[in-house]
C-alpha cells in the first residue's frame, strides 16, 4: 500500500493486489523526493517520463500535483493494467500515458521518435546489475530522452554508489537513495 502525499488526492491510500511483487517508494522517501522536486521545478508544466513504473505511485503522485504530461513505462502486464485502472479511478487518464514495454528496449526506440522529457524518474529493480545501471544512465542522458537542463532522478539502494560526470548529488533516505542528474547544455 502507498499513500498520495500531496495534491488533489492528498491522503489517498492505494493498495496493490497482494500477489504483486512491488516495492513502492516509502512515504518518507517519497515526501523528501517531492519536496526537492517542487523546490526546483514547476511540476504542472513538465513533460515527465516514469521508468520501471511498478504500480504507478510516482506517476500518480505527479498527476495529483497537477502534472499533465506523464509517460509511464512498465514491463509487467498486471502492473501496467493496475496503473491504468487506478488512473481511471482517480481521473488521471488524460494525464498518464501507460506503455507496456521493456524499459531498455523502449529507450533505444524512443530516441528516434523525437520526444524528450523535462523530468525522468527511474526506479529499476534493486537487483539490477551495475552495468545495467550505467547503461540506463547513458541511454537517458546521451540519447535525447532528457531535455537540455532537464532533471533525471534515479532511485537505487543506498549501498550502490553511482558515479557519472552529470551526477549532481545523491540524497540518502535509509536503504533508498535518489541520485540527481542534469544534462547540461555545455559539456
Question: Language-model features: where?
Answer:
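Class I S-adenosyl-L-methionine-dependent methyltransferase catalytic core
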Residues: 1-187
